[in-house]
Amino acid sequence: MMMKWIISILTMSIMPVLTYSSSIFRFHSEDIELCYGNLYFDRIYNNVVNIKYIPEHIPYRYNFINRTFSVDELDDNVFFTHGYFLKHKYGCSLNPSLIVSLSGNLKYNDIQCSVNVSCLIKNLATSTSTILTSKHKTYSLYRSMCIAIIGYDSIIWYKYINDRYNDIYDFTAICMLIASTLIVIIYVFKKIKMNS
């Protein structure tokens, strides 16, 4: 009987920490999917290029608020930035809760194009940022068109330290874990003392 109580109290004490960490991981993994997709590059004339980026997957819980796209060209190098501003579908705020910025450069000649891409995801709901980077990847140019399948070589994920709401939540979860552990230890010692 005592073992059941110990297991149930320990389970209840660990649940807030597990729930919090799994929700961060879920947000983190779904947000990263916005950085994967296909980049279409088409050189229409000598000095006119057309770039289009289509993400593979858009998480169902976000609505697009706005997007920006800028392209600069210097000789055979094209620099582009594609920004998404998304809002949580069920949130009450009108402000964006997710900002995704895909930027990179594309170098081309008559037979191939080389793409170097980085993606920054800033999740304002979880106060986390993710940076994905790729090295130069080469693709064949077919009829002045190049289709680049975007993949990444490194992923860096970090959480903001100065966010007050997440710090309060972290502190509450840790206090609950410590308090419930102390309750279990005191209960076990009292039971042992009574039995001896």
UniProtKB/Swiss-Prot annotation:
Query: What is the superkingdom listed in this entry's lineage?
Result: Viruses
List locations, semicolon-separated. Answer: Host membrane; Host cell surface
Residues listed as glycosylation sites in the UniProt record:
66, 116
Kindly indicate whether the keyword Lipid metabolism belongs to this entry. Answer: no
Annotated TM spans:
168-188
Keyword annotations for this protein, in alphabetical order, are: Glycoprotein, Host membrane, Membrane, Signal, Transmembrane, Transmembrane helix
Annotated membrane topology is: Single-pass type I membrane protein
- Chain ranges on the Cytoplasmic side, renumbered to this chain: 189-196
InterPro entries from the entry?
Orthopox_A43R (IPR009487)
One GO CC annotation, please?
A: host cell surface
**What induces its synthesis?**
Expressed in the late phase of the viral replicative cycle.
Leader sequence residues: 1-21
**On the Extracellular side, which residues?**
22-167
Question: Does the entry feature the keyword Signal, yes or no?
Answer: yes
Q: Which family does it belong to?
A: Belongs to the orthopoxvirus OPG172 protein family.
Output this protein's name: Protein OPG172
Organism from which the protein derives: Monkeypox virus
